[in-house]
């Protein structure tokens, strides 16, 4: 059965709205930026990691988007003032509750990792403003000896966080398009892509690095493989719907037609994947490592990932099993 209502953001079966789409988008940026930074740090012998802009980007992009996303989630609750119950009363049969627990553990390890890296800066601030907290230095010294395990665990948690955004939607079993096993992998790949794009913007704009810097060359290694992976997972996602029969075929038709079809083909496929992919494959090195060119491609990438979150969330709720 095809749809007979034209309003894209207000459909009869809508459970989750744009707040959740933005929440998923922000978590993806955090996940991707942290994975990239840990990969960079472990593949380079950095004398002072706190001065490296990829590491700095992870400290900001890993924490700020996640906290903003959590704030949005809190105010999305029917009773926001009861959020503390969600934070400390875990329900192991609730995907949302498990996500909150994952967020807490992830933030704990991220804070520990950042504390070790920015130890000198933190201790300088403590000695200047709050000398009584000098004991924090001893705690950081202990964490410093555990840097290796902390980084490995944080990398795994970041990857799980990226995949969790897909698990969250796939838990809506009454929606054929969302109840799809490919979603976690797709959201992990697209989240990593958005983390890479956000890191590029951070190091080039805030860090004022050159387009042909060592950091830029390192990040470029991951762009094309991630985009190709994302494209492949999208194909698997739609092929699964096509051969799923029944309401899955209806869900596919409804999703790729009308307003949300345009969002996918223009926002996700063209702006988010094809243009950045061709730009990386076809551009000469003089253009590929041009600062303004990288910024433009990164913006396209972020637009595409945001459109994908909106498309999956809203188009996925158009059809009920």
State what each model feature region is.
Residues 280-304:
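Interfacial loop-to-transmembrane junctions
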Residues 233, 301-308:
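Aromatic-anchored segments of alpha-helical transmembrane domains
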Residues 33, 37, 196, 200, ...:
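Transmembrane alpha-helical segments of multi-pass membrane transport proteins and ion-pumping complexes
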Residues 67-72, 153, 160-161, 305-320:
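Hydrophobic alpha-helical transmembrane segments of integral membrane proteins
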Residues 1-20, 49, 75-97, 166-186, ...:
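Membrane-interface interhelical loops and short amphipathic "cap" helices
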Residues 24-29, 43-45, 109-287:
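Long, contiguous internal "core" modules enriched in hydrophobic/ aromatic residues
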Residues 17-21, 48-63, 97-102, 144-152, ...:
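Alpha-helical transmembrane segments and their helix-start/interface "positive-inside/aromatic belt" motifs
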């Amino acid at each position: 059965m095809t749809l007979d209502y034209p309003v894209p953001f207000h459909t009869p079966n809508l459970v989750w709205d744009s707040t959740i789409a933005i929440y998923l988008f922000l978590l993806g940026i955090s996940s991707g930026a942290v994975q990239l930074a840990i990969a960079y740090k472990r593949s380079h012998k950095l004398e002072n990691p706190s001065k490296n802009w990829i590491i700095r980007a992870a400290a900001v992009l890993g924490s700020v988007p996640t906290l903003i996303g959590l704030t949005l989630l809190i105010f999305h609750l029917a009773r926001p003032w009861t959020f503390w119950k969600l934070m400390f009363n875990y329900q192991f049969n609730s995907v949302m509750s498990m996500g909150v627990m994952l967020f807490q553990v992830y933030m704990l390890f991220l804070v520990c990792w950042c504390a070790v890296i920015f130890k000198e800066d933190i201790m300088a601030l403590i000695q200047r403003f709050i000398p009584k907290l000098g004991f924090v230095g001893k705690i950081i010294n202990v964490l410093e000896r555990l840097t290796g395990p902390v980084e490995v665990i944080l990398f795994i948690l970041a990857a799980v966080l990226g995949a969790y955004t897909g698990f969250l939607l796939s838990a809506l079993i009454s929606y054929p398009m969302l109840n799809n096993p490919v979603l976690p992998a797709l959201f992990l790949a697209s989240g990593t892509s958005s983390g890479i794009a956000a890191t590029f913007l951070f190091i080039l704009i805030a860090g004022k690095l050159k387009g042909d810097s060592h950091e830029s060359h390192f990040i470029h290694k991951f762009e094309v493989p991630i985009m190709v992976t994302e494209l492949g997972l999208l194909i698997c996602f739609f092929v699964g719907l096509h051969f799923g029969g029944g309401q899955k075929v209806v869900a596919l038709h409804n999703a790729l037609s009308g307003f949300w079809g345009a969002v996918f083909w223009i926002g996700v496929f063209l702006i988010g994947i094809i243009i950045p992919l061709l730009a990386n494959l076809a551009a000469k090195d003089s253009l590929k490592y041009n600062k303004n060119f990288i910024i433009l491609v990164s913006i396209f990438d972020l637009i595409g990932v945001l459109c994908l979150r909106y498309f999956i969330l809203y188009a996925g709720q158009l059809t009920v099993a």
